[in-house]
Amino acid sequence: MPAPDPAPVRPALGIQGPVVAFHDPWAGDASDAVMRTGTGIPIPSQDPPPTPAQFVAALGDLGADFYVHHVLPTHEDPTAMVRDLTAGGIDVVLGNEYGNINGPYAEGTNRYDVPADTLRAAAASGRLVGVLYDEPEHLQIHADQYRRDAHLPHFGQTEGLGADEAIAVIDTTVHEIVGRVDAAVAGGGGARVPVLSEQVFPVMFHTLARAGMTPAPKVMKESFQPLQLGTALGAARQYDRELWICADLWGPDIGPWLTRAPGFPGHSPAEFASALRLAHLFAPTRLFVENIDVLVRHRGEGRFETTEHGEVWREFVTDFVPRHPLRWSHRDARADIALVHADDSDFGRGQRPFGNRAATAPETSRSVFAAWHALSHGQLPATGSCLHIPGYDFPRHRLNAIPRSEFPLAEGATEPTRLHGLFQATRGVLVFDEHVRADQLTDAGLIVVAGSRLPAATLAALRTRADAGATVLVASWLCDAAHARTERVGSGRWVVYGSLDEADALDALSAHLGPADVWTQRFGDHELRIRPASPGGETLDFEIADAAPRPLR
């Protein structure tokens, strides 16, 4: 792998713009002429509109280094916004969410691309630091989420295609998108910026990173944190990308806090505090919160009142981050356990793989869930990789009957619900796709191989790691005849399984899993140890320790 970059003292910190609290300060009344949330229900602005200067001052007061601005398709000229942000010393990320929801769309897709002229103008200021694609994996799989007139997946049509053919379609489109962004930014005289894949589902991270996008996982939301972060971090390491993290406050829970919409915020202030600390300690390039709506209330005339969640953010920015300078980068991440599997875009429902309505994901793709279940001491479900699977009923749905005109609510419930937590015990699990090389797996003492397909070259690379001392636990359906037998090879083990509850598989796992009450992740010579600080893992405790040396070569 490439040599790690020097560790930053901290990630750059950002805030995403308003979606229900008040108007976009530069678009004004036009903000309410489009839908700014993915709920499918128009929600009028709830607070008086701040002026651009007042809004930029509020961003500065909250400690924002950058602002995530989703472009309103009716107001694509960023000149005034960039001028005001520059005056406040704040960088900008341009996103495509509002266009995805409302159109216009790139031909033959449900995707809005920020126009080249908009990118050039922002780049000319020197303040553009990224271009964000909002939940592109979601909109590839669920192509009719917003656009209902035809089935047109985000990166292109995949009807009737197998996984490799569908990935080729996506790969071609992403290369074109990244190329267009690069050309527009260069045309404005700016330095190259990452094109972000901000994701809710823990699928397609590797597919999109391989094609040129930068992983930007959402924490909190409806995610399982070790699985979400282990997958995105593995993709960033395998494909040498930056890692951005979005602390997304939309979620399943309700409680005694200001509530702008059902499930917004859907995480308690205490959970938010732990999630921010977790994200910081994973040392991303940049970290931002979605959205400003739940950090402040605007009372008019530029008077912003910080909410309980806003006070959590302020404490994080002004106290926790300065007291915890980072001695590592996400590029220093090392796997104690590597999980290798191909991408079938299956998070548990098995439907519409890569947007193909005529197919379902292969049954063998579900072995990935079984692997995570085993690697987490049974704490992650064996049936899916996020909360959007059968068995989870979101408390936020209790608020759906309340007219949106009655929001914001002083509280969503008198007692908090706790469907979502932050903790499952895993031991340094990073995910790599089926194209991983042997030299990218040198730190892993255990390599678990699952999923639906595996190239012969990767099978040979895995055998090389077993020869060098690793235990390779590989699914029988992925092995050719020459590798279909459990045996000792070199100084390691090659263990073939049909099910992870077989005796040989359990033996291989037990030697590497670690304690059932600690989640760990190594970064170079440092080990981050995470423990639940409350029932259900709503809050976390953190410890930084020296990482034990690894004998593998």
Q: What do these predicted regions represent?
A:
Residues 482-537:
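An acidic, glycine-rich "communication" segment
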Residues 473, 538-553:
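C-terminal beta-strand-rich structural cap/linker in extracellular carbohydrate-active enzymes
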Residues 221, 345, 535-536, 548:
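Residues that cap or initiate secondary-structure elements
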Residues 1-451, 456-461, 466, 476-498:
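Glycan-processing catalytic domains of CAZymes
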Residues 4, 133, 486, 516, ...:
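Intrinsic disorder/low-complexity signal
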Residues 470:
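Glycine-centered, small-residue-biased loops immediately flanking beta-strands
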